[in-house]
């Protein structure tokens, strides 16, 4: 999965997919009542990027729905996964469940079209704080009470705080999550970070009793760091330059071992070769 980083304006969906992304990451900010409000990152952000592009969240979802609904004029067949980077740092811990419920209702209405031929991409809810695990339970409760528990089949999870792997496992236990787990590791492109924790996450993924299904590394903009991440065995790379990642995947060393994921590749299944 080549994951386009910080795609917060509808026009950027086309831009990143056309550069080679088959997945995008979108920031979601919340208002003081825990409603998802804008797709917005703000300052500071990655080096070399404009930090202030934004849409109203529900409007972004409508644009995203068009991009992921077969038959629509804006449809991109290769856009198969969307990571919502949920900026819950503005919320009190006790608002996490409400944020999950409100997020689910927004998605149900504006993305999934109330279960009627809505957008088809897989969705990862990426949460920066382990204490906010109830966002997951709230999300699930809302979809169930709205009569669409089947949509949870399209939803996965990530805790993005670079926490200890054991602590992350514990948070999932509390949330009742037993699958659909993506594990991120990384840092802004302005700084360097080693691959030690990535290797631990990959080892967990590949062990018989691990909780992780997929591992992704962020934010990677250079060819050598792309090669290093691929050598470590990641499933996804988040980047500001999808074309760089695509180029490296075309190198003879990687062409035989990796391919770009399509809609038929289940992002919740651990890859066994």
UniProtKB/Swiss-Prot annotation:
Catalytic activity entry: an N-(acyl)-sphingosylphosphocholine = an N-(acyl)-sphingosyl-1,3-cyclic phosphate + choline; an N-(acyl)-sphingosylphosphoethanolamine = an N-(acyl)-sphingosyl-1,3-cyclic phosphate + ethanolamine; a 1-acyl-sn-glycero-3-phosphocholine = a 1-acyl-sn-glycero-2,3-cyclic phosphate + choline; a 1-acyl-sn-glycero-3-phosphoethanolamine = a 1-acyl-sn-glycero-2,3-cyclic phosphate + ethanolamine
Record-level Gene Ontology MF annotations: lyase activity; metal ion binding; phosphoric diester hydrolase activity; toxin activity
Gene3D superfamilies hit by this protein: Phosphatidylinositol (PI) phosphodiesterase
Enzyme class (EC, first level): lyase
Subcellular localization, as worded in the UniProt entry: Secreted
Residues given in the record as Mg(2+) binding sites: 25, 27, 85
GO BP term, pick one: lipid catabolic process
This enzyme's EC code(s): 4.6.1.-
Protein's recorded name: Dermonecrotic toxin LapSicTox-alphaIB1b3
């Amino acid at each position: 999965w080549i994951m386009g980083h910080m795609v917060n304006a509808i026009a950027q969906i086309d831009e990143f997919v056309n550069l080679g992304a088959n997945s995008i990451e979108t920031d979601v900010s919340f208002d003081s009542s825990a409603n998802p409000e804008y797709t917005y990152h703000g300052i500071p952000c990655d080096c070399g990027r404009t930090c202030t592009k934004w849409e109203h969240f529900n409007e972004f979802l409508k644009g995203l729905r068009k991009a992921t609904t077969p038959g629509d004029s804006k449809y991109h067949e290769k856009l198969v996964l969307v990571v919502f980077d949920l900026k819950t740092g503005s919320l009190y811990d006790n608002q996490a469940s409400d944020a999950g419920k409100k997020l689910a209702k927004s998605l149900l209405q504006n993305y999934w079209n109330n279960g009627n031929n809505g957008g088809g991409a897989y969705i990862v809810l990426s949460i920066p704080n382990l204490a906010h695990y109830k966002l997951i339970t709230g999300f699930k409760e809302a979809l169930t009470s709205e009569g669409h528990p089947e949509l949870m089949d399209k939803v996965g999870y990530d805790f993005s705080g670079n926490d200890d792997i054991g602590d992350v496992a514990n948070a999932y236990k509390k949330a009742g999550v037993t699958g659909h787990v993506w594990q991120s590791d990384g840092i802004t492109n302005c700084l360097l970070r080693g691959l030690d924790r990535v290797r631990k996450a990959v080892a967990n993924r590949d062990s018989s009793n691990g909780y992780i299904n997929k591992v992704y590394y962020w934010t990677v903009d250079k060819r050598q760091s792309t090669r290093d991440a691929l050598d470590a065995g990641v499933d996804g790379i988040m980047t500001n330059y999808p074309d760089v990642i695509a180029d490296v995947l075309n190198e003879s060393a990687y062409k035989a071992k990796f391919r770009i994921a399509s809609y038929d590749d289940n992002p919740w299944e651990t890859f066994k070769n």
